[in-house]
Amino acid sequence: MRCRRLALGLGFSLLSGIALWSLWIYMETWLPFSYVPYYLPCPEIFNMKLQYKGEKPFQPVTRSPHPQPKLLEQRPTELLTLTPWLAPIVSEGTFNPELLQHIYQPLNLTIGLTVFAVGKYTRFVQHFLESAEQFFMQGYQVYYYIFTNDPAGIPRVPLGPGRLLSIIPIQRHSRWEEISTRRMETISRHIAQRAHREVDYLFCVDVDMVFRNPWGPETLGDLVAAIHPGYYAVPRQQFPYERRHISTAFVAENEGDFYYGGAVFGGRVAKVYEFTTGCHMAILADKANGIMAAWQEESHLNRRFISHKPSKVLSPEYLWDDRKPQPPSLKLIRFSTLDKATSWLRS
C-alpha cells in the first residue's frame, strides 16, 4: 500500500511539473510582452516596445561610410530641398502655405510648445510668448508648457483663442550642464504624464529666442530636426560631435549628415516621447561611466538623429543666430536667438 501511494505521489508531481513546464513554454513562445521604464506611468498608447518575443532586436541604421549631404549643394544661393533618405528640407519657397492650411486646418490639431525658463532665463519668457502669439501656428490650437523653478517670475501674456499656457514647476540645479542634461528626461516624463492627452504634435525649443516670421504646418512631421546655423556650410569633420569612443554619443569622422541644433526639435507626440526617452537613456549610460558628452544633450540629439533619421528637416531659417548676417541662401528668418551675455545668464 505504501509503495502504491508513493508511486501515485510521484506520478502526480511529475504531471504537475509537465503542466507547469508546458504553460511556461506557451507563455514564452506565444504571449508577446513589452517593456516600459519603471518610472514612467505611461498609458497603453505609450507602451512602446523595445523587443517582442519572436522578433530580432532592433538594429539602428548601420554605421557605414557615405557622402555628406551639403545644404548648399546646388548653388550658393539655393538650399538643398531633399535629404538622401528622402526627407524634405523645409525653407521659404518649398511649400504652399495656403494649400497646407486647407489640408491641416480641418484636422483640429493641437500643437504643444515646450520651453525651459530656469534662473535668469525667465527674463526671456515675455518676448518669446509675444512673438509666438504673433507668428507660431496661427489658426491652430496651441498649448505652451513652461518649465521653471520660479513660477511667480513668469509674466502673464495675453493669449489668443484656443491657446493655453501651463507653468510646470521644476527643480533648479546648481550647474547649467546639469539643467541641460535633465531636459530630455523632463520632456519624456511630461509626455507620459500629460502631454499625450493634450497635444498631437510637440515642439521643444529654447526660450531665449523669438519668432520673426510665420511658423506653420509646413513644419509638422513624425520627427523633425533643425539644421544648426553655425555648421550648415562646413564639412562634417568640423562638426562638434562627441569624438570620444567611451561616450554613447560618439560619432566617427565618416558619419553624420547635418549638424542639428538642440534648440529646436519636435514631431508627433509619440515620436518625441521615443526620441527624448532614447536620449535620456544614453545620457544615463554616460553618467554611469563618469562622462559628460561634449555638448551635453545636443551631442546625444545628434547621435540619435544619425541612427534614427528625422522625417523632416528644417533649414536654418527656423533656427538662426542674430549675431550672423543673413546669407543670400536664406530668404527670411523665422526663429532666431537673442544676443545675450551667456556667462551672466548661467551664473
Curated annotation (Swiss-Prot):
Organism per entry: Canis lupus familiaris (Dog)
Binding site for Mn(2+): D206, D208
Notes on the domains: The conserved DXD motif is involved in cofactor binding. The manganese ion interacts with the beta-phosphate group of UDP and may also have a role in catalysis.
EC number(s) recorded for this UniProt protein: 2.4.1.88
Native organism taxonomy: Eukaryota, Metazoa, Chordata, Craniata, Vertebrata
Topology in membrane: Single-pass type II membrane protein
EC top class, as a word: transferase
BP-aspect Gene Ontology terms: carbohydrate metabolic process; globoside metabolic process; lipid glycosylation; protein glycosylation
Protein name, as recorded: Globoside alpha-1,3-N-acetylgalactosaminyltransferase 1
Reaction it catalyzes: a globoside Gb4Cer (d18:1(4E)) + UDP-N-acetyl-alpha-D-galactosamine = a globoside Forssman (d18:1(4E)) + UDP + H(+); a globoside Gb4Cer + UDP-N-acetyl-alpha-D-galactosamine = a globoside IV3GalNAc-Gb4Cer + UDP + H(+)
Family: Belongs to the glycosyltransferase 6 family.
Catalytic residues (UniProt): E298
Record pathway: Protein modification; protein glycosylation
Cofactor remark: Binds 1 Mn(2+) ion per subunit.
Cofactor needs: Mn(2+)
Keywords: Glycoprotein, Glycosyltransferase, Golgi apparatus, Manganese, Membrane, Metal-binding, Signal-anchor, Transferase, Transmembrane, Transmembrane helix
Top-level taxonomic group: Eukaryota
Ranges of the Lumenal topological domain: 27-347
Residues exposed to the Cytoplasmic side: 1-5
Primary role: Catalyzes the formation of Forssman glycolipid via the addition of N-acetylgalactosamine (GalNAc) in alpha-1,3-linkage to GalNAcb-1,3Gala-1,4Galb-1,4GlcCer (Gb4Cer). Forssman glycolipid (also called Forssman antigen; FG) probably serves for adherence of some pathogens such as E.coli uropathogenic strains.
Gene it is expressed from: GBGT1
Amino-acid positions noted as binding substrate in the UniProt annotation, renumbered to this chain: F116, A117, V118, G119, K120, Y121, D206, V207, D208, H228, P229, G230, Y231
